[in-house]
Amino acid sequence: MTRRGCWPHRIIFSLILLTWTHVTLAALIRSHTFSNWPKPPCKMYYPIDPDYEANCPDVIALVCATNGLNYKNECFFCIDRWEFGPHIEFVKYGKCE
C-alpha cells in the first residue's frame, strides 16, 4: 500500500490550519480603535413625519455623546439629537468614560 493516498488530506489540513492561524493572529494583533469609524448617518434615522414614532433596532452598539449619555445604538443617538437639538454631538462609538 502506498502513502500517496494521504497527501490530499495533509494538504487540505495544512491549508486550513495556515488560514485559521493567519486570521486569528491578524485579529489579535490589529487594533480595534473606534476613532477611525465614521460618524453615525443621522439623516437615515430622521423621521419624515413629525408624529412618527421611532422604531430603532434592539441592537447594543454603544454611542457616546457630548451630553455624557451612552446611547444603546446610533439610532437612539440620532433620534435624541433630532428631538433635542444639534448641541448633542457624537463623541465616539463605545461607552463614555
UniProtKB/Swiss-Prot annotation:
- The residue range of the signal peptide is 1-26
Assigned keywords, A-Z: Disulfide bond, Protease inhibitor, Secreted, Serine protease inhibitor, Signal
- InterPro entries for the chain: Kazal_dom (IPR002350), Kazal_dom_sf (IPR036058)
Q: Which residues form the Kazal-like domain?
A: 36-97
The molecular function terms of the Gene Ontology recorded here are: serine-type endopeptidase inhibitor activity
Q: Which cysteines are joined by disulfide bonds?
A: 42-78, 56-75, 64-96
Q: Site (Reactive bond): give the residues.
A: 58-59
SMART domains, per the entry: KAZAL
Report the induction information. Up-regulated by testosterone.
Compartments reported by the entry: Secreted
Q: Which CDD domains match?
A: KAZAL_FS (cd00104)
Q: In which tissues is it expressed?
A: Restricted to the epididymis, with highest levels in the initial segment, including epithelial cells, lumen, and sperm (at protein level). Localizes to the sperm heads, where it is restricted to the acrosomal region in epididymal spermatozoa, but not in testicular spermatozoa (at protein level).
Among the record's GO biological process terms, what is one?
A: negative regulation of acrosome reaction
A single Gene Ontology CC term: extracellular region
Role description: May be a serine protease inhibitor. Essential for sperm maturation and fertility. Inhibits sperm acrosome reaction, protecting sperm from premature reaction.
Q: What is this protein called?
A: Serine protease inhibitor Kazal-type 13
- Organism of derivation: Rattus norvegicus
Query: Gene name, please?
Result: Spink13
